[in-house]
From Swiss-Prot:
The lineage of its organism: Eukaryota, Metazoa, Chordata, Craniata, Vertebrata. GO terms for biological process: cell differentiation; chaperone-mediated protein complex assembly; heart development; negative regulation of cell differentiation; negative regulation of transcription by RNA polymerase II; positive regulation of gap junction assembly; positive regulation of skeletal muscle tissue regeneration; positive regulation of striated muscle cell differentiation. InterPro entries: HD, Homeodomain-like_sf, HOPX. One of its GO terms (molecular function) is DNA binding. One of its GO terms (cellular component) is cytoplasm. The keyword Repressor applies. It holds the Pfam family Homeodomain. This is Homeodomain-only protein.
Length: 73
């Protein structure tokens, strides 16, 4: 498995990612993730990694365990 270099999203990419995280869905399904990746120009893997890290950050800020399952599960 090839590992991708860590890529820091640009300000424009971050705006798209944050908008989708805050206003659309904190748990994007594979199709939505693919669309977000296409919109940002990031790979699906990079986009998924960003969402996972951002979700852990959000959970921490809310006083929730960073690794807990979704209430939707």
């Amino acid at each position: 498995m090839a590992t991708e270099k860590s890529v820091t999203p640009t300000e424009e990419q971050l705006e798209i990612l944050e908008y989708n995280f805050c206003k659309v869905n904190k748990h994007p399904d594979p199709t939505t993730l693919c669309l977000i990746a296409a919109e940002t120009g990031l790979s699906e893997e990079q986009t998924l990694k960003w969402f996972k890290q951002r979700l852990a950050e959000w959970r921490k800020s809310e006083g929730l365990p960073s690794e807990c399952g979704s209430v939707r599960d």
